[in-house]
């Protein structure tokens, strides 16, 4: 049975279906993730609103047992800076894919919807897309059932010390308790400090981000380890991000010719 619903929606991806139809995966604020069928997509009035990472207020027919349909739309938001930059687009696509992977279909999650939308908005506003992605990755871990402690020592619970991370205890150790895990990570102490900040930061309060390239590289490598150990998903969009270093070198060489 189809039911009418008006809700904010964000297109996660689309794919071809038959000759000129499309299946469009949309994360809606009120009805969760749904798959929509769009007939004759290239000629449809819906064409502007079914592109990936496009947001709009959608009038929909929701089907709990199959494909849903878009009847109309208004207030379309396109993220121009994201769409014009290969690198930002890659990271934006990755956070959208992470949100998709963390949530079952048809399950409303307005908080996650708002978090994803705000992440894309800040990327589009020019904030550091790599660090925004790191923050998103850390805060969304709980939706994969992962709880990590970067705030206080797993043994004495003291704070504000040069911590190191222990996979054995899923948390940090202070210098007095480094010996509790001979296989601790030997991290730069700045990383646990930053990850503790990332867990707590609210994007509504975030105006600027500035980290040195070497710290960003260390964060990227360590968060990859966390995801390999605790989450175990391998997204195509993440593999593309991992290849961006090569793309960057190619583009830089072309610009210098």
UniProtKB/Swiss-Prot annotation:
Matches recorded under Pfam families: RecO_C, RecO_N
Keywords, sorted A to Z: DNA damage, DNA recombination, DNA repair
UniProt function note: Involved in DNA repair and RecF pathway recombination.
Species: Streptococcus sanguinis (strain SK36)
Gene3D superfamilies: Nucleic acid-binding proteins (2.40.50.140), Recombination protein O, C-terminal domain (1.20.1440.120)
GO cellular component, one term: bacterial nucleoid
The keyword DNA damage belongs to this UniProt entry's keyword annotation: yes
Positions of disulphide bridges: none
Name of the gene: recO
GO biological process: DNA recombination; double-strand break repair
Protein name (record): DNA repair protein RecO
Stated family: Belongs to the RecO family.
Record InterPro entries: ARFGAP/RecO, DNA_rep/recomb_RecO_N, NA-bd_OB-fold, RecO, RecO_C
Keyword Zinc: no
């Amino acid at each position: 049975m189809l039911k009418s619903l008006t809700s904010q929606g964000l297109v996660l991806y689309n794919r071809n279906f038959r000759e000129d139809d499309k299946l469009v995966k949309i994360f809606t604020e009120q009805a969760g993730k749904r798959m929509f069928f769009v007939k004759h997509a290239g000629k449809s009035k819906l064409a502007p609103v079914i592109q990936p990472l496009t947001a709009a207020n959608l009038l929909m027919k929701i089907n709990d047992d199959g494909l849903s349909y878009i009847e109309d739309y208004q207030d379309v938001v396109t993220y121009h800076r994201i769409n014009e930059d290969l690198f930002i687009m890659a990271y934006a696509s990755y956070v959208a894919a992470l949100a998709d992977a963390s949530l079952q279909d048809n399950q409303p999650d307005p908080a996650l919807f708002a978090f994803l939308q705000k992440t894309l908005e800040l990327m589009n506003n020019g904030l550091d897309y790599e660090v925004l992605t790191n923050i998103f990755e850390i805060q969304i871990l709980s939706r994969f059932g992962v709880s990590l402690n970067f705030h206080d020592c797993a043994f004495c619970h003291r704070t504000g010390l040069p911590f190191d991370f222990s996979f054995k205890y899923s948390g940090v150790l202070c210098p007095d308790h480094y010996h509790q895990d001979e296989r601790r990570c030997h991290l730069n102490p700045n990383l646990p400090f930053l990850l503790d900040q990332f867990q707590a930061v609210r994007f509504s309060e975030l105006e600027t981000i500035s980290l040195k390239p070497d710290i960003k590289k260390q964060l990227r490598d360590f968060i990859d380890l966390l995801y390999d150990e605790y989450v175990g998903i391998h997204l195509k969009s993440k593999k593309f991000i991992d290849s961006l270093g090569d793309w960057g070198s190619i583009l830089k060489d072309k610009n210098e010719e």
